[in-house]
Amino acid sequence: MGSPSEISQRIEVIKRRDEFERDPLTFLRKWRRKDITVQKKIIHAKNTLDNIQLDDSILSKCAEICIAVGSDGLRGELTLLRALRALCAFNETTKPTLEDIRKIAVYTLSHRLRRDPLDDTSSEVRVKRKVNELIDDK
């Protein structure tokens, strides 16, 4: 993941970081309740991972995307499927959708691409492009 590209998000990150640096204890107290809420949500998601169902259409789309982006081996698909399960569990849904694949693919696949010395396009952009083509094409 990189830095946010939206100005408002960047400003918020900068403000929070500055707030932490000026007074770490107050900052930690301020965010403690939110941290606990997120922690509970993560624990709940971890406990429901086995309930996430991956049907053949999702498996097929993941394989299609991995082939299209040139991901080496099968680890791309396996990583993408694990991430889809985690996303669904965190969002309290039981079946991943094509939109879930669109959200998560760039994070799981961009570092798995073979390098093309003649293509200066970033791997993130290449993955996004292929995912959008394949999902929008259905």
For the regions a language model picked out, list residue spans one by one.
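C-terminal engagement/docking regions of AAA+ P-loop ATPases
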Residues: 63-76, 86-138
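Phosphate-sensing "switch" segment of ASCE/P-loop ATPases
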Residues: 1-69
